[in-house]
């Protein structure tokens, strides 16, 4: 039997059974779930009603994630699926769906932050390493007074909350997928911050 999105198979409001009046129709069809997994990208095109197409992602490993408080987005690698409100099975099988809580690589965001504010973010304090730092390092690079004035002005607004900074130190940050990988073929989302981050950290901790 094909997957159907009709209501002909449902019982009446009174609880009585309905008699089938016709066969299934093309416009009532449903398709199996994509169950997008973590892995090197594999996206299929699906022809839909009206000759339109959907992009069915079967495997994805990267996504475009937004850092809302800083107004910046970067493409980064998805490392793991850690929480899903609807189903624990989706966490165990590392399935990417909308609203999955995932762990992403923090490097692109750290690089942007350090270049934008000239402030260290998530760097382990190591004096030996500090001596060996080369001149190409964004933080130690020589700048004119005029340019430095601009950065000092920016630094007033460059505060990152403690919970997020701790994640940057580990090199992994929690994010939420807001796109639908099985429909648009992408796993884009946003970095968790504030109360939302607090909520999910508590949830993940209680599961362990």
Swiss-Prot record:
Any one GO CC term of the record: membrane
Keyword entries, A-Z: Cytoplasm, Lipoprotein, Membrane, Nucleus, Ribonucleoprotein, Ribosomal protein
Listed GO biological process terms: cytoplasmic translation; larval lymph gland hemopoiesis; maturation of SSU-rRNA from tricistronic rRNA transcript (SSU-rRNA, 5.8S rRNA, LSU-rRNA); ribosomal small subunit biogenesis; translation
Principal cellular location given in the protein's record: cytoplasm
Region Disordered, annotated ranges: 1-23
Molecular function terms from GO: structural constituent of ribosome
Lineage top rank: taxon: Eukaryota
Keyword Disulfide bond assigned: no
Annotated InterPro entries: Ribosomal_eS8, Ribosomal_eS8_CS, Ribosomal_protein_eS8_euk, Ribosomal_Se8/biogenesis_NSA2
Subunit comment: Component of the small ribosomal subunit. Identified in a IGF2BP1-dependent mRNP granule complex containing untranslated mRNAs. Part of the small subunit (SSU) processome, composed of more than 70 proteins and the RNA chaperone small nucleolar RNA (snoRNA) U3.
Designated name of the protein: Small ribosomal subunit protein eS8
Organism, as annotated: Drosophila melanogaster
């Amino acid at each position: 039997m094909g997957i159907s999105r009709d209501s002909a198979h449902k019982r009446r409001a009174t609880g009585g059974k309905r008699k089938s009046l016709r066969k299934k129709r093309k416009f009532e069809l449903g398709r199996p779930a994509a169950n997008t997994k973590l892995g090197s990208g594999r996206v299929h095109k699906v022809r839909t009603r009206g000759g339109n197409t959907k992009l069915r992602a079967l495997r994805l490993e990267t996504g475009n994630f937004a850092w809302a408080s800083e107004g910046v987005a970067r493409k980064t690698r998805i490392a793991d699926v850690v929480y899903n409100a609807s189903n624990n099975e989706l966490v165990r099988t590392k399935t990417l769906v909308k609203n999955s809580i995932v762990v992403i690589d923090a490097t692109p965001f750290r690089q942007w932050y350090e270049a934008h504010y000239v402030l260290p973010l998530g760097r382990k304090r190591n004096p030996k390493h500090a001596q060996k730092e080369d001149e190409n390092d964004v933080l130690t690079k020589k700048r004119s007074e005029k340019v430095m004035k601009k950065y000092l002005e920016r630094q007033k607004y460059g505060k990152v909350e403690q919970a997020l900074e701790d994640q940057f130190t580990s090199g992994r940050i929690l994010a939420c997928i807001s796109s639908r990988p099985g429909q648009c073929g992408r796993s884009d989302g946003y970095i968790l911050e504030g109360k939302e981050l607090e909520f999910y950290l508590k949830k993940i901790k209680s599961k362990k």
